[in-house]
């Protein structure tokens, strides 16, 4: 986002293109993450993205692809994410009878969850762009649909931040709750975490360093909380994954379940 922004004369000319390059690198990491999630889910007959996080991601991509992104490259990026989300969603639906046997209402309501996410993202975007200058700092040089004072970068930061929080915290919580690595892997964790760092935190950090008058939101206490929580969850995740893999059981069909009595019960059902 922010590809058409016009920074003040004292800002180095390379800052805005570099921030967009970081965003693109983060987007590619997430593309790889979605592909890995789909393959791992198919192989282990499970899912690797928490339902709430998946619903928020899809809804965020829909709203930005349809209503916010202006440049062809931006639209292509959001549409690519949406297309890559389809196999991840399919894998989640396939795994629902087994993974959500204890909560069938959750498994049957992914579409309403996406709809609510779309409504929330659309409402926030409508409020944010209702008047020029909304947000943190001086929005001179921030352009959207030919009008100055509308900061797509800040809008994307806040809305993506909520989605990132649900992904990072949700994936960690899911690992604790399920006690197995079905649907996930170290590679998925790495590309997901790198995508968060490069695509969400990196661009805004760079812009704040060189163009602080328009990007003060980066050091807002709420923003610091969101980033710190996401990074902490992502740093803890591989350590928890290592412990989980020591006790999990791989079944003959490739499925992975928690060790102990749960694994014995699952094996008994299969036989």
Where are these regions (language model features)?
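Alpha-helical membrane-protein topology signature
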Residues: 1-271
